[in-house]
A protein has these predicted regions:
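Long alpha-helical, hydrophobic tracts
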Residues: 1-54
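Extended, helix-rich structural scaffolds rather than catalytic motifs
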Residues: 2, 40-225
Length: 225
């Protein structure tokens, strides 16, 4: 059990300190696989035997939260036994992950890694389009939102494929009732996420391709070794 604990801790460290987008995504997928293979939850690696408590982990997003980041937060949270909500104050905007034990911390790490990867890939896309003579596409209405939705959609597909390959994982990532009760107690106001988009299908397709390549990182096995 000690060796498994150490592996899990190493993977969590990889997620938060990954040098590249591929390493971060591969590590997060490796974490899911290792937990399921050993019939474990993240709280099982705690040093004490006390019941896992529901905690919150906030990510500071500055003065504004792009709508696509709200969508990304929900996708990541659902796949790490968490719920997520956005918080607004005079000091800035945050997305908050709610989960048992270390779940919220891991979800937060994966969210930051995925958001950074998406931003980097979008900049690469914009540079490529400019080199092809299409100008500064990042300033064109709806382009970034559409591209990001494609990226997020493919990440969601990567999660779904991993679950479909191992039926036990479907149970492993179910959000605990304690987390749902915590969210109910907060009494949040429900708002609809509105991402500004464009009708150009090629923009979303490019985002999807980039996100899928990121989501299916080829270093999963190495990260879990």
């Amino acid at each position: 059990m000690k060796n498994i604990d150490e592996k899990i801790k190493k993977i969590v460290a990889l997620i938060d300190g990954a040098a590249t987008e591929g390493e971060a995504r591969a590590a997060s997928l490796a974490l899911q696989r290792l937990l399921v293979a050993n019939n474990l939850k993240l709280e099982d690696i705690n040093l004490d035997d006390s019941p896992a408590e529901v905690g919150e982990e906030a990510c500071d997003l500055g003065r504004r939260i792009p709508e696509w980041k709200k969508t990304l937060a929900l996708v990541v949270a659902a796949n790490y036994r968490c719920r997520a909500y956005t918080s607004y104050s005079n000091n800035g905007r945050t997305v908050v992950f709610v989960g048992e034990g270390e779940d919220s911390v891991v979800a937060s790490c994966c969210f930051r890694a995925s958001a950074n990867a998406a931003e980097n890939c979008f900049r690469t896309y914009c540079a490529r389009m400019k080199a092809l003579g299409y100008g500064n596409v990042s300033r064109q209405k709806g382009v970034k939102g559409t591209w990001m939705l494609g990226f997020i959609s493919s990440l969601k597909r990567a999660y779904a494929e991993q679950v479909s390959n191992d039926e036990s994982m479907a149970l492993a990532i179910v959000v605990p009732e304690s987390v749902n009760r915590h969210m109910d107690g907060i009494g949040l106001r429900t708002t609809k996420i509105k991402v500004r988009t464009t009708s150009d299908p090629y923009v979303k397709a490019d985002g999807y391709e980039s996100g899928y390549g990121f989501g299916r990182g080829d270093r999963v096995t190495a990260a879990s070794a």
